[in-house]
Regions:
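Glycine-rich phosphate-binding loop of ATP-dependent small-molecule kinases
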Residues: 1-200
Length: 200
């Protein structure tokens, strides 16, 4: 796949999931991938926060779940994702922060399998202690970034999302990256993997 954004009519979107715990640096790396390889990046978290901010239908439930560090329902996420992906002109798409559990995968398979090509999952691996330190140290004014909620988010990640890493590993399309490195080193490792896997 080249860097051109020109696509053939009817071409299926190529999807690369980006997974990792809270504070692992997914957002920063997605921005760099967009700049270097001309992907379109979509963060489920950003879209959900926008949904709440715009006070769209059912936003109260989503807002409460986010404040409590709970996962948003698969049906809610899938509705938003499907609309976004199938209407996106750029067919090289990063999905940041999804799937988060087996239910997400099942919902995706049911609704998206025939419409897209999943190229794999990029997993940025960072220790829990480091993720907690990063989250407590950043100041983005997020309601879901206090110490108690961070603990819940990390717990949820261990329980729900770690098995997703194993799922993609079994599918032989997991790209595992050491997220304990500097931002620039991490970007370089990802770029090398993209070239190696034909994702550039």
């Amino acid at each position: 796949m080249g860097c051109s954004q020109e696509t053939r009519v009817g071409e299926k979107p190529n999807i690369l999931f980006v997974i990792g715990g809270p504070g692992c640096g997914k957002g920063t790396q997605c921005k760099r991938i967009v700049e270097k390889f001309h992907y379109k990046s979509f963060s489920t978290g950003d879209l959900l926060r926008k949904y709440v901010k715009d006070k769209k239908e059912g936003y109260e439930e989503i807002e409460n779940q986010m404040k409590e560090g709970k996962l948003i329902s698969s049906a809610t996420l899938m509705k938003v994702l499907k609309e976004y992906i199938l209407n996106e002109e750029n067919k090289k798409i990063l999905v940041d922060g999804y799937p988060r559990n087996q239910e997400n995968i099942d919902e995706w398979e049911k609704q998206m399998k025939d419409h897209v090509v999943v190229k794999g999952a990029l997993y940025i691996e960072v220790s829990n202690d480091e993720m907690k330190k990063r989250l407590l140290g950043r100041n983005e004014g997020r309601a879901d970034d206090n110490e108690e909620t961070i603990g819940k988010r990390l717990e949820t990640f261990e329980k729900e999302t770690k098995p997703i890493v194993e799922y993609f590993e079994r599918q032989k399309n997991l790209i595992r990256i050491d997220g304990m490195k500097t931002v620039d080193e991490l970007s370089e490792d990802i770029a090398n993997k993209f070239k190696e896997k034909g994702l550039a």
